[in-house]
Amino acid sequence: MTKLSVNINKIATLRNARGGDVPNVLEAAKNIESFGAEGITVHPRPDERHIRYADARELKPVLNTEFNIEGKPIQQFIDLVLEVKPAQVTLVPDAENAITSDSGWDTVKHRDYLKEVIAEFKANGIRTSIFVDPVKKMIEGAAETGSDRIELYTESFAVDFEKGNSNAVKPYAECAKIAHELGLGINAGHDLSLKNINYFKENVPYLDEVSIGHALISEALYLGLEKTIQQYLKLLK
């Protein structure tokens, strides 16, 4: 079964909007785990506009499921990950002023850099994943870095699927097969939702994990957090 890791950045965004500690990120994460999620994801950025570096440090000891920290591997981020030692680190090529992640790595151009960073994480017992577009060349490049997994960037699928284009899943299915043949595990994330997750999961083989945040938290405003997570788990079976 494909695992569900819930990205809690939006909970931190809500907290930060008023200052203080409501909603409490740690309590939210523990509730999400109790509702059945198999992992917690955070994506700290240098400006700490949602998840703070301190949140990542405080979350690790209270979590009972896999902890995944995403981010651009600047030195501050690398130091955080090596200190916290999550189950998984996902490397994302965040642009300076981007509101959210908007592209995968060029794993050919940045191969040597990624290889060096990944080796350090793996030496510390941390599973590694690289955020990539569904492009064969980028999947092959990811394998050459020594990464354990890839995370397929799914925005283009979500946008096209919303427009009625069910063929939007084909590049992802093809890249998942290539990744599997190269010995890579397969994660996916970005704009996956209750509307499209089942179709994506049913058509993309070897899918180990999905990381979902914005859509899940938005849907929870209407359905409640527990019910929303339960619906995702049902669709991912």
Curated annotation (Swiss-Prot):
<dbReference type="InterPro" id="IPR036130">
    <property type="entry name" value="Pyridoxine-5'_phos_synth"/>
</dbReference>
<comment type="subunit">
    <text>Homooctamer; tetramer of dimers.</text>
</comment>
<dbReference type="GO" id="GO:0005829">
    <property type="term" value="C:cytosol"/>
</dbReference>
<feature type="binding site">
    <location>
        <position position="7"/>
    </location>
    <ligand>
        <name>3-amino-2-oxopropyl phosphate</name>
    </ligand>
</feature>
<feature type="binding site">
    <location>
        <position position="50"/>
    </location>
    <ligand>
        <name>1-deoxy-D-xylulose 5-phosphate</name>
    </ligand>
</feature>
<dbReference type="InterPro" id="IPR004569">
    <property type="entry name" value="PyrdxlP_synth_PdxJ"/>
</dbReference>
<feature type="binding site">
    <location>
        <position position="100"/>
    </location>
    <ligand>
        <name>1-deoxy-D-xylulose 5-phosphate</name>
    </ligand>
</feature>
<feature type="binding site">
    <location>
        <position position="45"/>
    </location>
    <ligand>
        <name>1-deoxy-D-xylulose 5-phosphate</name>
    </ligand>
</feature>
<dbReference type="InterPro" id="IPR013785">
    <property type="entry name" value="Aldolase_TIM"/>
</dbReference>
<comment type="similarity">
    <text>Belongs to the PNP synthase family.</text>
</comment>
<feature type="binding site">
    <location>
        <position position="18"/>
    </location>
    <ligand>
        <name>3-amino-2-oxopropyl phosphate</name>
    </ligand>
</feature>
<comment type="function">
    <text>Catalyzes the complicated ring closure reaction between the two acyclic compounds 1-deoxy-D-xylulose-5-phosphate (DXP) and 3-amino-2-oxopropyl phosphate (1-amino-acetone-3-phosphate or AAP) to form pyridoxine 5'-phosphate (PNP) and inorganic phosphate.</text>
</comment>
<keyword id="KW-0808">Transferase</keyword>
<feature type="active site" description="Proton acceptor">
    <location>
        <position position="70"/>
    </location>
</feature>
<keyword id="KW-0664">Pyridoxine biosynthesis</keyword>
<protein>
    <recommendedName>
        <fullName>Pyridoxine 5'-phosphate synthase</fullName>
        <ecNumber>2.6.99.2</ecNumber>
    </recommendedName>
</protein>
<comment type="pathway">
    <text>Cofactor biosynthesis; pyridoxine 5'-phosphate biosynthesis; pyridoxine 5'-phosphate from D-erythrose 4-phosphate: step 5/5.</text>
</comment>
<feature type="active site" description="Proton acceptor">
    <location>
        <position position="43"/>
    </location>
</feature>
<feature type="binding site">
    <location>
        <position position="191"/>
    </location>
    <ligand>
        <name>3-amino-2-oxopropyl phosphate</name>
    </ligand>
</feature>
<dbReference type="GO" id="GO:0033856">
    <property type="term" value="F:pyridoxine 5'-phosphate synthase activity"/>
</dbReference>
<feature type="active site" description="Proton donor">
    <location>
        <position position="190"/>
    </location>
</feature>
<dbReference type="Pfam" id="PF03740">
    <property type="entry name" value="PdxJ"/>
</dbReference>
<feature type="binding site">
    <location>
        <begin position="213"/>
        <end position="214"/>
    </location>
    <ligand>
        <name>3-amino-2-oxopropyl phosphate</name>
    </ligand>
</feature>
<feature type="site" description="Transition state stabilizer">
    <location>
        <position position="151"/>
    </location>
</feature>
<dbReference type="GO" id="GO:0008615">
    <property type="term" value="P:pyridoxine biosynthetic process"/>
</dbReference>
<keyword id="KW-0963">Cytoplasm</keyword>
